[in-house]
């Protein structure tokens, strides 16, 4: 009798373990309409005004403790990379993501959005993966993850220059990221 009870529990734990860092789910379509949309507000920055899409109207703190305003991303395509420090898929994406950030510097934004752990582990991940050339938000409470309806790490949300989601999904090893950004900057 004990085996009948124990077996389903073991199978459940095993299946959750196999899921690991999340699925390889891929959605080339924009996120649902309840996520940040194209609604815009005018923000004054440096004396000028810029249209700030609703999607970019958020604030946070970087893993280095500096304030971050999503409005600073307005006007350029933006890659939001949602990762967790303990995630092997995220580590595999790090080099390609850093390469894209360098390749498209000044043409597109790349921002890491770290979650599902503490800030010390997040800083260690950035140091260990060599991804410190672009900003990483410390989203310990999941505010930015929820805003973009991200439910698992190792996902990318790519916004066009108008703040519209043009891609949301997993790119194993970051493969294909450069092509997606090139299509928005060319």
Q: What is the predicted function of each stretch?
A:
Residues 79-80, 110, 156:
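Hydrophobic beta-strand anchors of alpha/beta hydrolase catalytic cores
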Residues 69-91:
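Short active-site neighborhood of thiol/selenol oxidoreductases, capturing the structured segment around
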Residues 32-70:
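N-terminal "domain-start" segment that seeds a small globular fold
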Residues 17-20:
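C-terminal motif of bacterial Sec signal peptides marking the signal peptidase cleavage site
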Residues 1-9:
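Bacterial N-terminal signal peptides that target proteins for export
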Residues 127-132, 140-186:
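Thiol/disulfide oxidoreductase modules built on the thioredoxin-like
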Residues 91-129, 140:
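Structural microenvironment flanking redox-active thiols in thiol-disulfide oxidoreductases
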Residues 22-25:
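Bacterial signal peptide processing site
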């Amino acid at each position: 009798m004990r085996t009948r009870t124990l077996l389903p529990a073991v199978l459940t734990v095993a299946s959750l373990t196999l899921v690991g860092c999340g699925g390889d789910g891929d959605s080339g379509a924009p996120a649902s309409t309840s996520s940040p949309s194209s609604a815009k507000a005018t923000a004054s920055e440096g004396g000028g005004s810029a249209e700030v899409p609703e999607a970019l109207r958020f604030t946070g703190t970087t893993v280095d403790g500096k304030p971050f305003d999503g409005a600073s991303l307005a006007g350029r395509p933006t890659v939001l990379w949602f990762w967790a420090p303990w995630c092997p898929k995220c580590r595999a994406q790090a080099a390609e993501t850093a390469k894209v950030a360098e390749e498209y510097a000044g043409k597109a934004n790349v921002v890491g959005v770290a979650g599902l752990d503490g800030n010390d582990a997040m800083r260690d991940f950035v140091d260990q993966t060599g991804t410190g050339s672009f900003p990483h938000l410390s989203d310990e409470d999941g505010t930015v993850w929820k805003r973009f309806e991200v439910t698992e790490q190792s996902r990318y949300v790519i916004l066009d220059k108008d703040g519209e989601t043009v891609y949301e999904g997993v790119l194993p090893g970051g493969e294909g990221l450069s092509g997606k950004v090139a299509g928005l900057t060319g």
